[in-house]
């Protein structure tokens, strides 16, 4: 089972600064232009630490500068360490596309690292690639601070866990801030004794990594690097990482990552190749397709996916209704029913059969890329930058946990959670 505990968080002194000017989005979505804007917003914006150069451009000197900057901020009192161990409840509120208010509530705490495997308290759900891990490792080595959390889905019973978590927010928040994406964030800092009931529930079942596989695996590498320093029963801080854990019924929505492809087949030829694996409903135009894919879909209880995939290729728009028998027969026989029911796994089969290569191979040589925006993916086809776009529906968070519980992982870039906790709400120094 996961080992969770309070810790002495490092926070901005909100009494002396405007928190809205100090936060940043997750590092991997910050463009060079946005990074410049964040730096101009406030000299102490967390992007100076989290992304010390444009994404992918940082070198050893940049990481060293980030570490020195953070040390200077601590010395000057810009960031202050909690005097006692605490946990922090984080709530997000936002309006969905229909204008209805949505809410997600999670808990910041410290989680003891452990390797993946049977019986482990931590489970991955997605395959990872190496590049981002090298960058995050260099930053961790230099700063010795977890600057952003790994996000987890709790495996414990949702109703009881949510009740214990929400019992901690029956008072005024300790901090409140709105970010530029329209999300309102509220924080409650809770003492160890106050947090004990919810920590006990969250620790009662394995947790699944929702976002941050690279950061988790980076922390494992960092721990292995320091293993020779371990002394007997010592409990070094580098044995832990910063976690943000959501009960299944309190998490942000798990949204789809669409596939965009360059190359043949395309148009009618592509749709003909898809026919053995799905019923094909042709639509009038891409506008109709985007409206259909934006419409909510109601899943049957326990279903992993809708079975609906949108396709736009050389002016041809269609909705596929996946034939689970046909696609399931081409997946590994040992896969769980939960994995076989995932739309993204059905799409892996469809791409492989239509194009003759798997998605990972096509991504590696530049023939396939990913988009979080369905309209942007379709526009790339309209502008002839790509030959086809495959659009997916969102999946339930419970399906992610189900696949992870079976010891399986989803394809790379299967999903993402949005909105996100901004970087800078709190940090976890690798110290006690």
Annotate the PLM regions.
Residues 1-432:
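Surface-exposed, charge/polar-rich loops and edge strands
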């Amino acid at each position: 089972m996961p080992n969770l505990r309070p810790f002495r968080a490092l926070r901005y002194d909100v009494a002396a600064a405007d928190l809205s000017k100090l936060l940043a989005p997750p590092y991997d979505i910050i463009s060079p232009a946005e990074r410049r804007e964040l730096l101009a917003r406030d000299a102490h914006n967390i992007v100076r630490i989290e992304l010390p150069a444009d994404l992918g451009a940082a070198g050893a000197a940049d990481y060293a500068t980030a570490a020195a900057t953070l040390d200077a901020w601590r010395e000057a009192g810009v960031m202050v360490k909690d005097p006692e161990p605490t946990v922090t409840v984080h709530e997000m509120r936002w309006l969905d596309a229909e204008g209805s208010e949505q809410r997600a509530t999670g808990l910041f705490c410290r989680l003891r690292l452990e390797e993946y495997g049977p019986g482990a308290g931590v489970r991955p759900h997605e395959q990872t690639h190496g590049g981002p891990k090298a960058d995050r490792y260099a930053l961790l080595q230099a700063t010795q601070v977890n600057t952003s959390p790994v996000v987890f889905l709790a495996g414990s019973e949702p109703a009881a866990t949510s009740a214990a978590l929400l019992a901690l927010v029956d008072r005024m928040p300790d901090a409140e801030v709105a970010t530029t994406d329209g999300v309102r964030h509220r924080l409650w800092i809770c003492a160890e004794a106050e947090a004990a009931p919810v920590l006990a529930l969250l620790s009662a079942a394995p947790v699944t990594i929702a976002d941050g596989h690279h950061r988790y695996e980076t922390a494992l590498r960092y721990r292995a690097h320091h293993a020779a320093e371990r002394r007997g029963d010592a409990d070094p801080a580098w044995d832990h990482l910063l976690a943000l854990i959501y009960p299944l019924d309190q998490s942000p929505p798990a949204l789809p990552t669409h596939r965009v492809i360059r190359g043949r087949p395309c148009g009618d030829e592509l749709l003909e190749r898809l026919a053995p694996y799905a019923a094909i409903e042709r639509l009038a135009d891409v506008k109709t397709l985007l409206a259909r894919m934006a419409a909510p879909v109601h899943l049957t209880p326990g279903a992993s996916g809708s079975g609906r995939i949108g396709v736009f290729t050389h002016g041809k728009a269609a909705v596929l209704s996946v034939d689970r028998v046909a696609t399931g027969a081409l997946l590994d026989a040992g896969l769980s029913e939960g994995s076989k029911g995932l739309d993204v796994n059905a799409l892996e089969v469809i791409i492989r059969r239509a194009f003759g290569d798997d998605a990972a191979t096509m991504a590696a040589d530049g023939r396939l890329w990913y988009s979080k925006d369905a309209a942007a993916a379709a526009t790339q086809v309209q502008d002839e930058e790509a030959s086809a776009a495959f659009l997916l529906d969102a999946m339930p968070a419970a399906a992610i946990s189900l696949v992870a519980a079976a010891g399986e992982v989803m394809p790379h870039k299967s999903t993402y959670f949005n909105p996100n906790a901004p970087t800078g709400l709190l940090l976890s120094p690798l110290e006690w």
